[in-house]
Amino acid sequence: MRTSLFVVAVAGSLLIAPAAAQAVPCAVTDVMIKASTAWVTKGTDLKANNWSNANFHTGNIAQVRTTGISNHKTWPWVQANKYLLPLDPANPYAPDPQASGEAYLAVSFFHPEPAVLQPLRDNLRAQAKTGKFDYWKSPDALTMSLPSFTEVAVRDLDQELLDYSYKSYRSLKHRTFNEVTGLWSPNVQTNGWAVQGLAKAILMLPKDNPYRADYAKTLRKSAHTLRYLQRHDGFWGATGKDSAATAMITYAFAAGINAGVLDKDTYLPYVQKGWQALQTALDADGLLGWTAARNSWKPASAGDSAGFAVGSFLLAGQQLVPLTPGC
């Protein structure tokens, strides 16, 4: 299936948010600010150019665009990285380094200098030229890589890039997706990575785009099963509660509602319950705990925190704003 980019999506269109300069006083945005501030104050390994920090900074820009309040941490991080992806020369098209590209795309809303995105563009186009579609080995790639491919393709009207990322998605889906259960993995967090990335791509693409329709169909199938895996306390998790899985799935459900691809009456209660659960994972300073390691089966504890989970928390909060009265 091939589709054309007839409509240009607005840069950064995954961000359903008020104007960047307008602060929005509401309980959701208040806790977003508190959580992002806590992470940049108390978090660990904040300088590294890696997928976890990239996921945080993508969410951090979402927080800035939603609340109008900045902690002024993302642009210095991007500058320190010299706009480069943390590539492994032995595996230059691995998905994880491309997560940094999504953070660069997010910050380019405020810093549109072409140099910011040039290394990302070069890497994605070089990958597409290989004609190989099996670089994505795990469903995590739908968050690590698909958003960067999709947004660059939409911004640049690059049909080749859009086609390539869709074919990579189809290859991954053929290898890892269970059409009967709607799950990508037995591990709930892994499914969180998948639905989070699909929701981002859906928000980026024009509504009449057939690839968007396919992503939405898969998201609906996963969401149908994942809603029944929500714990009584509102969390999702592979082994006990996991704030990362919960934030990712809460984001995906809320974004799906906002995009018009998930039924609001059906899924909003799960979104609200997930968001309420996440509030209980914040300590007194706003640091998000109960974060399981990436795709781990090891139970999390109250003191376990990670940048990637905070980023997903901030993305979830952003999508909650249009769904929350008074925000």
Segments predicted by a language model, with ranges:
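Secretory targeting and sorting signals
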Residues: 1-23
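Low-complexity, intrinsically disordered/propeptide-like segments
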Residues: 8-9, 17-18, 145, 291, ...
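CBM-like carbohydrate-recognition segments
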Residues: 24-123, 137, 238-327
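Short amphipathic alpha-helical segments at helix-loop
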Residues: 44, 108, 133, 150-154, ...
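Extended ligand-binding groove/face enriched in aromatic
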Residues: 83-186
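Extended ligand-binding clefts on enzyme/binding-domain cores
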Residues: 139-143, 150-250, 262-293, 304, ...
